């Protein structure tokens, strides 16, 4: 075997407790994660102790298994890692890496056109089996898998559906999104050190728009150096001409906000003329650099008749569409989003027949989309596998669930994680503790969000009006389908949507 190196495009985590070893290792060029356990995990743990682009002595890997494996056996294992891009023989030049990424980007475009995904394969946080397996294991040891950083509420778009506190939804309202005492880069450095020590796998950067944040590039560098997987949610406008710079930090994925292939509709939602063109220019740059991208598209009244065009648009850029019918109200208590932007009536039923959305209702889905829920389980992973940090440093369970467990200006994340009584109470809250949820026929169709309930009622334990409405709509649609009454009436989704007119932005 030639000299082996740890490539600059891998990251991961190693966890050992109670004599059990587990590891997760990413190939960030190909967007793949791999799970390891026992001795193979110990070897991966040894690999992760070396810096990126460092040569790895075989003897160090032999010693990581307490000499239980010979050098020949280690070489065989390393060859397997090399075959999937987790190690390299020799140090690759930047020109070779760039060419490989370009090839992968072209392949991703081709695959997005050819591959037809089945119902329910399109999740908001798309993960593979390796990530799910590792997440389930570390959850048992009370280790969060992902922490979201809301870096700032400042943004270069003015989206009508934005749930950031202080967001304005029309030209007559004044935005107060920028009036925040945001934590600085020193707070983030301490936070990242804490999260690395705990064993957190992934960081998500969001906002506002994260690239409006001062010191964003320094922060991304610190995340990369500490071996976190990195997801980013952005509109992309601040990344024109900077995609290649970001690509060198190997984000696991970048989610771009795209609301319609119709430029007029998209720009009316962002309230920034030319925003779709700019976002798509950035999408092309990401595709050319082989960075995995998603087109994130919430459905609302404005784009309800053209949202499906985002899926076709995504194919041109090798992107994965993330289309969702669920809207979230502002965390400051403004419920105008679900009250005025939420699709309803016959139009909602037609959209729920779209197999490209997670809340699809149809015979192809088990029980037409209804799911029996274990009342001894939590509704979601907010506050357990997922945590959130606001721009001011508040530690919350999710960016759409504004209950606070502490603030990083006062205490470290580790102190809050280990000692917050309110966090402990929340982590032991299960469906059976809720006042009404799980007691109605519609509840099997509910995509319950404790954060939405908190925004509406000041407590997550009361049923959300918006969630209940959606559950009722899905249940009633399922009953109609069982009786043979399909709102599509034998037509395609696109043909049925043509019978409706988009709600003008001025009406909101």
Residue spans for each PLM region:
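Cys/His/Pro-rich metal-binding microdomains
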Residues: 156, 160-163, 381, 396, ...
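Short, charged low-complexity linear segments at domain edges
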Residues: 121-144, 362-369, 406-433, 442-444
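Conserved alpha-helical substructure of the radical SAM core
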Residues: 76, 86, 105-245, 249-253
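Acidic, low-complexity/disordered tracts enriched in E/D and polar residues
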Residues: 1-50, 75, 101-102, 113, ...
């Amino acid at each position: 075997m030639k000299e082996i190196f740890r490539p600059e495009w891998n990251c991961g985590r190693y966890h050992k407790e109670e004599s059990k070893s587990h590891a997760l290792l990413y190939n960030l060029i190909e967007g793949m994660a791999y799970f390891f356990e026992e001795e193979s995990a110990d070897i991966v743990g040894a690999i992760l102790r070396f810096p990126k682009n460092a040569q790895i002595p075989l003897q160090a890997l032999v010693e990581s298994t307490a000499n239980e494996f010979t050098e020949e056996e280690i070489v065989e294992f390393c060859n397997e890692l090399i075959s999937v891009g987790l190690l390299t023989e020799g140090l690759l030049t930047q020109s070779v890496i760039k060419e490989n990424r370009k090839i992968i980007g072209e392949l991703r475009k081709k695959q997005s056109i050819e591959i037809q995904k089945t119902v329910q394969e399109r999740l908001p946080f798309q993960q593979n089996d390796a990530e799910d397996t590792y997440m389930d294991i570390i959850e048992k040891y009370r280790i969060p898998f992902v922490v979201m950083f809301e870096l700032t509420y400042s943004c270069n778009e003015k989206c009508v559906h934005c749930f950031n506190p202080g967001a304005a939804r029309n030209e007559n309202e004044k935005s107060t999104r920028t009036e925040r005492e945001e934590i600085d880069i020193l707070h983030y450095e301490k936070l990242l050190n804490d999260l690395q020590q705990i064993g957190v796998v992934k960081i998500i950067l969001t906002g506002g728009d994260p690239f409006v944040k001062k010191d964003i590039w320094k922060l991304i560098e610190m995340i990369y150096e500490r071996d976190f997987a990195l997801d980013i949610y952005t509109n992309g406008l601040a990344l024109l001409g900077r995609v290649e710079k970001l690509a060198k930090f190997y984000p696991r994925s970048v989610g771009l906000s795209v609301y319609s292939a119709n430029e007029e509709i998209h720009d009316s939602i962002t309230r920034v003329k030319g925003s779709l063109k700019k976002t798509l220019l950035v999408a092309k740059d990401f595709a050319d650099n082989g960075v995995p991208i998603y087109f994130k598209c919430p459905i609302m009244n404005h784009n309800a008749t053209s949202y499906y065009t985002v899926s076709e648009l995504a194919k041109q850029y090798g992107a994965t569409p993330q289309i969702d019918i669920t809207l979230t109200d502002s965390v400051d208590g403004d419920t105008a989003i679900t009250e005025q932007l939420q699709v309803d009536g016959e139009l909602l039923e037609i959209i729920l027949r779209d197999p490209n959305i997670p809340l699809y209702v149809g015979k192809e889905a088990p029980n037409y989309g209804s799911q029996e829920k274990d009342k001894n389980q939590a509704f979601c992973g907010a506050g357990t596998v997922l945590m959130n940090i606001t721009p001011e440093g508040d530690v919350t369970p999710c960016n759409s669930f504004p209950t606070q467990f502490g603030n990083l200006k006062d205490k470290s994340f580790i102190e809050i994680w280990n000692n917050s009584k309110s966090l402990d109470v929340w982590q032991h809250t299960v469906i059976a503790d809720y006042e009404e949820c799980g007691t109605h026929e519609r509840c099997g169709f509910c995509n319950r969000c404790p954060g939405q309930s908190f925004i509406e009622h000041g407590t997550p334990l009361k049923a959300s009006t918006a969630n209940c409405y959606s559950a009722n709509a899905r249940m009633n649609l399922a009953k109609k389908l069982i009786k043979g009454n399909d709102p599509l009436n034998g037509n395609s989704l696109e043909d049925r949507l043509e019978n409706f007119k988009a709600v003008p932005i001025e009406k909101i």
